[in-house]
């Protein structure tokens, strides 16, 4: 099994990948280093595939990985509706990519980070 260590212990690496995956699901576009983006791409693709399946088992599998964070708050008929990242994954992103067979994200290179010249990229969902 090959993966990037990203200069962290295994628990730190898993936590970081969960955080970045959840942030990408919520914001649909984030700026990060190239190595992190390449590593998180595989986890995001797996989460979108679970979102496309949409059954109870897929929801439970995704819930073990995606953090329970608020994705959006809106007002409908005098009531406040709070949507979590998991709900966004299954209600918005899953149906959006229903016809697409993989390749849900793209990585675009940007200028290097100012402090240490690390290669920076934008990872986003394909429309």
Curated annotation (Swiss-Prot):
A matching Pfam family: Ribosomal_L17
Top-level division of the source organism's lineage: Bacteria
Gene3D superfamilies: Ribosomal protein L17
InterPro entries from the UniProt entry: Ribosomal_bL17 (IPR000456), Ribosomal_bL17_CS (IPR047859), Ribosomal_bL17_sf (IPR036373)
Biological process terms in GO annotation: translation
GO cellular component: cytosolic large ribosomal subunit
MF annotations from Gene Ontology: structural constituent of ribosome
Keyword list, A-Z: Ribonucleoprotein, Ribosomal protein
Ribosomal protein is among the record's keywords: yes
Assembly and interaction partners: Part of the 50S ribosomal subunit. Contacts protein L32.
UniProt family annotation: Belongs to the bacterial ribosomal protein bL17 family.
Protein name listed in UniProt: Large ribosomal subunit protein bL17
Gene name for this UniProt entry: rplQ
């Amino acid at each position: 099994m090959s993966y990037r260590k990203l200069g962290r212990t295994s628990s730190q690496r898993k936590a970081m990948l969960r955080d970045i995956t959840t942030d990408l699901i919520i914001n649909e576009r984030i700026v990060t280093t190239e190595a992190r983006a390449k590593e998180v791409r595989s986890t995001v693709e797996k989460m979108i595939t679970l979102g496309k399946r949409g059954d109870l088992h897929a929801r439970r599998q995704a819930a073990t990985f995606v953090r329970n964070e608020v994705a959006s708050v809106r007002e409908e008929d005098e009531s406040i509706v709070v949507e979590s990242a998991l709900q966004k994954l299954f209600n918005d992103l899953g149906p959006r990519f229903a016809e697409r067979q993989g390749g849900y994200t793209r990585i675009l290179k940007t200028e290097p980070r100012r402090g240490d010249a690390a290669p920076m990229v934008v990872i986003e969902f394909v429309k």
